[in-house]
């Protein structure tokens, strides 16, 4: 085994509860950084990475403007983006919205959904299909519905732990 100087080891996990405690002892990982869920401006920057001006876009609209529209749709707190209600350990209920569970991976998935839909439409019509506000809105809606529907089948305690949230006792979904 050869000796190495000035080596930096970086580890990442979205399941801190699954990391062996021996790895977390003092002197093993000197700096721990928690990266939370992206806020609206951070989401726009993430989407900008996947939705670029070199894609076929709606006339007169640039990719950054589409990214902003997509992010503002996701981060809306209207009934349209209400996933469920959750009961905290203290018994209080509060609304959970799509914005509360969004992640970089989810943002990428939404853009991928829109791209896939555009490719399918291009194949069907034989024409280039531009990435438009309605196309992106449909992708957000698909992600929202899939996330909302999955809430009915989860274990609340495990779900809150996996999603890095305060413990919750119950989840009440819309009928």
Predicted regions and their residues:
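Conserved H-loop
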Residues: 14-15
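C-terminal engagement/docking regions of AAA+ P-loop ATPases
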Residues: 8-10, 84-175
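Conserved C-terminal "switch" segment of AAA+ ATPases
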Residues: 4-8, 22, 31, 36-107, ...
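Alpha4-beta5-alpha5 switch/output surface of CheY-like receiver
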Residues: 18-20
């Amino acid at each position: 085994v050869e000796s190495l100087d000035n080596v930096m080891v970086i580890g990442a996990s979205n399941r801190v509860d699954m990391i062996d405690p021996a790895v977390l002892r003092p002197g093993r990982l000197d700096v721990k950084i928690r990266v939370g869920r992206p806020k609206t401006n951070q989401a726009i920057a993430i989407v900008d990475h996947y939705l670029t001006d070199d894609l076929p876009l709606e006339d007169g609209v640039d990719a950054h403007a589409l990214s902003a529209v997509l992010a503002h749709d996701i981060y809306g707190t209207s009934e349209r983006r209400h996933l469920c209600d959750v009961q905290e350990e203290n018994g209080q209920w509060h609304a959970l919205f799509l914005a509360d569970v969004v992640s970089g991976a989810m943002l990428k998935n939404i853009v991928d959904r829109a791209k896939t839909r555009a490719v399918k439409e291009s194949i069907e019509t034989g024409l280039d299909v531009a990435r438009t506000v309605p196309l992106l809105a449909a992708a957000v809606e698909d992600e929202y519905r899939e996330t909302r529907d999955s809430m009915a089948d989860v274990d609340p305690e495990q779900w809150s732990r996996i999603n890095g949230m305060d413990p919750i006792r119950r989840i009440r979904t819309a009928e």
